[in-house]
Amino acid sequence: MTIRYTGNAAYGYANSLYMALRESGAPPTELPEPGFLECLTTMPFGTDYLRVGRDLLVYFSSPLANPDQGLSTALDALGWECREERDGTPEAALARLGEAAARGPVLAGPLDMGALGYMPQHAQLSGSDHFVVVLGVEGERVRVHDPDGYPCVAMPAVEFLRAWRAERVRYAPTPYAMRSGFRQTRRPTREAMIARTLGAARAGLAADPGGPDRYGGPRAFRLLAADLRGAMAKRLVGHLTSFALPLAARRSHDAAAFLREAGHAEAAGLFERKAQCFGEAQYWAVQERWTDTADLMEALADLEGALIHALEPADASGG
């Protein structure tokens, strides 16, 4: 039985986008749920394994995009535009943030979670990216809705600026990125949104940067399995169990629903099996049963290969 999941997930940018569009006048009956928005970013489609010396980091997400780019991709598919601003001095950034928040919702990010002092474990999260909706600048404070479970939270502006600078976020090209002034310019159907996304989804699944420090596709899963069977497993445990595996399970579950709606029943079934494998791996990784965890990564490599084949256009597969 398949029951759609509702609950917590590390969907910082998808949940923030949902809040921003809802408060910008998106009709509630037309605004897709965060899981659908996540798929429009193309992030659930692919794997990105970074192996730099003894430093290992895996993201079960497209190696062709990052969350900042994904937001722009999703907005385009949705038929919405916004004002996008970034860079500048801290003083100028804070001033424009306050002015924009006085007019409507502001989606700010990426932020460095390591500088978000209202998070109990922020000291262990340096370099992890995040997105929030800014409610306003109140003198020396910034107030936000943080979709990780912190509504209406306020923090010193100087600390917010430190997080917003995002110096340790690996993909942040410039500091102080924000989106505001959201407006709808087209009203595409859900079918059109999905069709606009499928090409990038296929490309993300098949993408493999090829090393020597970064890998994707089925090879990324097989390399991860080999590392989990060796001495490197303990370097990955915290990242896997607290973030990467539960997020991958949720993304795969939502991607299954997305592809089912698109009429790709075979691919949807494969993504649902991926979600189950990630969910099983969560238990084994917490228990530090690395052989069992590695076996599931091998199974996921096979599923990824099957997905690439299942989503090939008919002319490419000889159909």
Question: What is the role of each PLM region?
Answer:
Residues 111-116, 120, 162, 183-187, ...:
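Amphipathic, soluble alpha/beta structural segments
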Residues 1-34, 38-186:
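Conserved active-site-adjacent core of cysteine acyl-enzyme catalytic domains
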Residues 243-319:
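Charged, long alpha-helical assembly modules
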